[in-house]
Amino acid sequence: MTKKILLAVSGSIAAYKAADLSHQLTKLGYHVNVLMTNAAKQFIPPLTLQVLSKNPVYSNVMKEDDPQVINHIALAKQADLFLLAPASANTLAHLAHGFADNIVTSVALALPLEVPKFFAPAMNTKMYENPITQSNIALLKKFGYKEIQPKSSVLACGDVGSGALADLDTIIQKIEEQL
């Protein structure tokens, strides 16, 4: 049976890497459903992820094409794994504190407890190291989320430090170890 991965993409310059990630996961035989925040759509168009995942992209929690299906509940029920990559500081904060104000956070809150949940942060070093962000990460870990650590690299702003999205090979390895 094909394993179903929910790939949640939040607003980070690293969102463009979700295209390659969804493509690689699909090539490995996973069924990938992509969820996007509005901020993520500013960095990469949903159509790109739809073509590469070969599935519709969900970006509006209030859009229900089929009145018989409540998307955020249905997606959560069928997931074998949830991956937030890239995970912005904003989306991590929303998840840690139970906000369900977009498709990503609504699906995440509706996930069955036994579904493995991963997040791969991608943000400026100062944002990543901020005590508020670290507190949110600790809270998510307490709730059962697993962090795929960011790497140290030259960031979009030119700074060098921790906060770059983990290599896709690392992310995929963590997923395959879990599934």
From Swiss-Prot:
A Pfam family that this protein carries is Flavoprotein
Got a GO cellular component term for this one?
Answer: phosphopantothenoylcysteine decarboxylase complex
Cofactor: how bound:
Binds 1 FMN per subunit.
Q: In which pathway does it act?
A: Cofactor biosynthesis; coenzyme A biosynthesis; CoA from (R)-pantothenate: step 3/5
Which GO terms of type biological process are on file?
coenzyme A biosynthetic process
List ligand-binding residues for substrate: N124
Cofactor names: FMN
- Write down the InterPro entries for this protein, in alphabetical order: CoaC_strep (IPR011847), Flavin_trans-like (IPR036551), Flavoprotein (IPR003382)
The reactions it catalyses are: N-[(R)-4-phosphopantothenoyl]-L-cysteine + H(+) = (R)-4'-phosphopantetheine + CO2
Write the record's keywords in alphabetical order, separated by commas: Decarboxylase, Flavoprotein, FMN, Lyase
Provide the active-site residues from the annotation: C157 (proton donor)
Q: Can the keyword Lyase be found in this entry's annotation? A: yes
Single GO term (MF): phosphopantothenoylcysteine decarboxylase activity
Query: In the Enzyme Commission scheme, what number(s) does this protein have?
Result: 4.1.1.36
Q: Which family does it belong to?
A: Belongs to the HFCD (homooligomeric flavin containing Cys decarboxylase) superfamily.
Physiological role: Catalyzes the decarboxylation of 4'-phosphopantothenoylcysteine to 4'-phosphopantetheine.
Identify this protein by name: Probable phosphopantothenoylcysteine decarboxylase
Gene that this polypeptide is encoded by: coaC
